[in-house]
Amino acid sequence: VREIAPLLSKKIHSASFCRTDGHADPVATVEAYKLAAERNGCIFHIGREIKKLCINEGKLEGVVSSEGKINTNSCLLACGVQTNLLMTDSNFSVPMSIPIVTVIQTEPVDKILKPVIGVGNANMSMRQEKSGSFRLSSGAQDWNGSLTEKDKKPYACPSLEKVYATLDLGFNVLPLLKESPIKDVWGGLLDLTPDALPVMDKVPDINGLYVASGFSGHGFGIAPATSHIL
């Protein structure tokens, strides 16, 4: 343990290590996917909210957006925790609960941690990014269902209690983390299925409608394979 991550707490006596694991900046990765899709003819409408599916006699005929109707006979719902809200006219729904994950980002500091750290019971993970910032994430926590608005977008804000609890877990694993000033805090909502595996299928009673939801926090890692399946 000390050879790989010498500054971890002395409370840690053993760990597993996977040389092929890694991590990447999720924002930069999504932007790279977007640019690659555009090179292949994909058109994005950012900020265009889908209000309703247009279904007639068991067939999809289009979707109603915040800027008008889009006629189509094929649609993939891959909208995470919002998926079931768009399927109220169907007998199908994705079984999911919606917990929140507390995420804390620090100001950049000197590089002291190379591997991604995860705790065995999955209640905390951390990594040091290329910039030097640390990013800590809690495990799945109960969410009260409330959303606020930030930069004209819905925003899930974790409670101070959850922030402090996540920090304490981080300090127990990496004591030097106490010297890193906090830069930002936010909450991430999980579309968590009972077995923590996604549902990718045709919607049985609506011809032309497909669903990919319930990724349970694994979407970033399995996205490349998911694209081939869909």
Predicted feature descriptions by range:
Residues 204-230:
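C-terminal lid/capping helical subdomain adjacent to the catalytic/cofactor pocket in oxidative enzymes
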Residues 5-12, 54-61, 70, 192-196, ...:
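A short, glycine/Asx- and small/polar-enriched loop/turn
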Residues 110-208:
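Active-site lid/adjacent beta-loop-alpha segment flanking the redox-cofactor pocket in flavoenzymes
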